[in-house]
Amino acid sequence: MIFAAGLGTRLKPLTDTMPKALVPVGGEPLLHHVIMKLKDAGFERIVVNVHHFAQQIIDYLDANRNFGLDIRISDEREGLLETGGGIKKALPFFDQASPILIHNVDILSNLDLAQVMKTSETTPDALLLVSQRKTKRYLLFADDMHLKGWTNIETGQVRSPYSSLREDSSLHDSSTLFTPFPSEARQPVAFHPSLQKLAFSGIHVIWPSVFPLFSEMPDRFGIIDFYLKYCHQFAFVGHEQHDLQLMDVGKLDTLHDAEQFLNNLQ
């Protein structure tokens, strides 16, 4: 599934007249780059969610005969459903016995997506591609790379289904969801050295074992909320590819760099 419904506010004024998915990089729209990457990896069915200038995306796919693939449109023109709600709405399009790879439309990388799917076979519930890039928001993982929480290092906010991340025992005892750290605990990793603080890449694989959980969620929610709600019950595993080259093309000042990035990947 390709997330292409976003408003692309960080790419204004380009997105005043087109969807983010059709912003060109290296002579082709972002959507083209992601579709071809999926096609090269052997994917045959792709769901693309649409909202902002949705018809432009539909027309682009029609003009290219869906690139020879089975491409389905998950229409969110009535209202953006966010990343989690977008998956929930699109689930009927998928084989309920097979995993789904989710890919943000504005992510370029050197990832071998076929290998990502193979790696995900060792994780029963979900595989999250992560990296050590600098950001304000991080996912928190234990030594075995199982997801334990989320933090905003700028505000000090921590979200986790565990009562505390400061003691070893807390990593095994579930409690009230999203119990925050005390306000003075600004750096949660410092309180629990075994936790790793890693940035989410916008690429992840979800297995059928957790598909039923989406029915318990509202129609509109973020996928990180989903992962945090259930990470104490299911195996949501982070995967860090050490030779990863990845770029988020989400801002105007990254477009020029993105073209050079693509050239370097070739």
Locate predicted features.
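N-terminal nucleotide-binding beta1-loop-alpha1 segment
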Residues: M1-D16, K37-A41
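Conserved N-terminal catalytic core of the sugar/cofactor nucleotidyltransferase
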Residues: I2, P24, E28-N104, Q115, ...
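Active-site metal-binding loops of divalent metal-dependent hydrolases
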Residues: L7, V105-I107
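Hydrophobic packing residues within well-ordered alpha-helices of enzyme cores
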Residues: L11, I57-L61, F214, A258
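Conserved beta-strand segments of alpha/beta enzyme cores
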Residues: A21, D70-R72, A235-V237
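Catalytic-core segments of class I nucleotidyltransferases/pyrophosphorylases
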Residues: L101, L108, A114-E121, R133-K134, ...
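Short beta-strand-to-loop element that shapes/binds the nucleotide-sugar donor at the catalytic cleft/hinge
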Residues: L127-D144
